[in-house]
Amino acid sequence: IRDHCVTGVQTCALPILGDQGTVLPSGARVRVRSLQTHGRSLEVAQPGSRTAANLVGVQKDEVSRGEALVIGGWMQPSPLFDVRLRVLPEAPRPVSHADEVHFFCTTFDCVARVRLLEEDVISPGEEQWAQLMCTRPAPLTHGDRFIIRALSPSETIGGGVVVDAHPGRRHRRRDPQVLEWLAALSQADRAGQALLRLGENDQRAANAIV
């Protein structure tokens, strides 16, 4: 039997014994055989708890650090996402448009290129809207927090929050409509985000017809 035990912090959907799930971004299909937290067996994992899950259908060498167990298919990994990016006041240098940085979110990490959407530079202590283009798809969702480090020397220079994990395209820089959209999306709950995306899709369809 192919099985493997994985650990991590539960964030959203609640795994239940026997659930079918997917390990992302690898795409491996698995079944939850057992759940534990702090040595205690569970039938349902609760959000915020550090959980160990025994998965049937995958072996150790098929799962990498930083991957996510997803129940219900609600998450899709993407190499491009929209963020609110802040540079630490004590950072030794600013972050410039097209800089490459080391990106960390929970246990996921990769190299990412920064696309600044407002100005060409974020000085220490400042923030702005940006896109991050990762070297591999990242299993992220709205509200995930992250940090960035310089590639060399490796030191933390900033961080932020994911606003849209699936923008689908690179935004035009310094576009007022894009900046307003990101501000609205950052303040909306999940239902509000869905309505905003429906409105955006309707507008794209209208533009295509015109």
Tell where the protein language model's regions lie, with residue ranges:
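Single conserved hydrophobic/aromatic residue that forms the stacking wall/gate
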Residues: 1-12
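A generic "binding-loop/recognition-motif" signal
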Residues: 10, 28, 38
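Conserved hydrophobic positions within beta-strands
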Residues: 10, 20, 32, 114-116, ...
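Short catalytic-site patches enriched in acidic/histidine residues
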Residues: 13, 35
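Ser/Thr/Gly-rich low-complexity blocks that favor extended beta-strand/coil architectures
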Residues: 15-31, 103-110
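C-terminal effector modules of nucleic-acid-centric enzymes and ribosome-associated factors
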Residues: 38, 43, 58-210
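Membrane-interface junctions of multi-pass transporters
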Residues: 47-51
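Structural microfeature recognizing short secondary-structure transition sites
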Residues: 52-58
